[in-house]
Amino acid sequence: MNDVIIAEVVELGRHTKMELPTKRAAALFVGDVVGVAYGCRYATRQFEGVIPPGNGPCHLLSVGGVCGEVVGMPFDMEPPTILRPIGYLRGADGKRVNLERLGIVGSEPPFGAAKVILVVGASMDSGKTTAAYSIVHGLTRAGAVVAAGKVTGTASAKDPLIMEDAGAVKILDFTDAGFVSTAQCSSAQLWRILTAIGTHLAQANPDYIVLEIADGIVQRETQLLLALLRENGCIDFTVYTCNDSLGVASGVNALRKLDFEVVAVSGSVAYSPLAAREAQAQTDLPVLLREQLQDPAVEQLFVKHSAEGRDSAMKNLVLKFPTIPNPLSRTASSL
């Protein structure tokens, strides 16, 4: 894992571009010679990939330059881009270049004095990144200093860039710790990533650190990381994202059993008023749209309350968020 190889593009498929060190996605052409790194991928709506046993042809697993062998994919997805390995990239000492040896390291305990907000979801594409950058933006608008980190996932520059656009003063992810992907990482490796990200984000002296975990709460690495976060008391507040009300109820209950203080729900479930009401009835939590998370009032979510005071505080808080116009109120002339 994380070994860098030089490879030739043999056949274009799903990924027709690859990100450069400048973070620009460059077009790929058959015959191009590229630098990529071996890694696994776990993505229910993309590829499931593993590190191949030999040095034969492999696949491009992500736009971020992760390569491996695809062992599963959605039925409606294009086949992967095929690469032919030429050889390992080696340093001046003749050793293989492995990104893990070049990653940042941290200390314990991480995060410093910042309040840590965890964004975790039911699955891939449940709205985690949207919720995370929206919280960053809302807190920034409230006058807070906010840093952001993505602890797990597959290498891509897209998410860190949008966190920067949202106002985060410092952004780090698992790639900064030397991992092109966190699929199949051990607990020790995940803890190393977490402490590295937390330590270096804390150096910016933020009021808040917003952490996103990729994929869903039933995914192996997510479960390992949640256990680590719980054992070490790292998280102050949790926001859960989901696509439907039943998933909201089961996910929030699972997180509460792990002693995470879930303060709000977001994701695509929030965009159906009926589904949002169902979810709120199941959890007694505010179900918030992206636009509401981006409002300065979001900071009031992240205040510690007694068990007795939380229910009334949450009900009062919902009233302070801006009202999103109902689509039924549109007139023909405004469409």
Set out the residue ranges of the language-model regions.
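Structural motif
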Residues: 4-6, 32-35, 58, 67, ...
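Short, basic, glycine/proline-bearing loop/turn elements
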Residues: 8-11, 177-186
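Long, basic/Gly/Ser/Thr-rich N-terminal segments
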Residues: 1-82, 87, 281-287
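Conserved catalytic-core segment of NTP-binding enzymes
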Residues: 61-100, 162, 188-203, 208, ...
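NTP-binding/hydrolysis catalytic cores, primarily Walker-type P-loop NTPases
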Residues: 1, 16, 22, 282-322, ...
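N-terminal phosphate/diphosphate-binding loop that engages ATP/GTP or pyrophosphate donors
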Residues: 137-181, 255, 274-282
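Walker A (P-loop) phosphate-binding motif
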Residues: 102-154
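Solvent-exposed alpha-helices and their adjacent loops that cap or buttress functional pockets
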Residues: 26-27, 62, 108-112, 138-141, ...
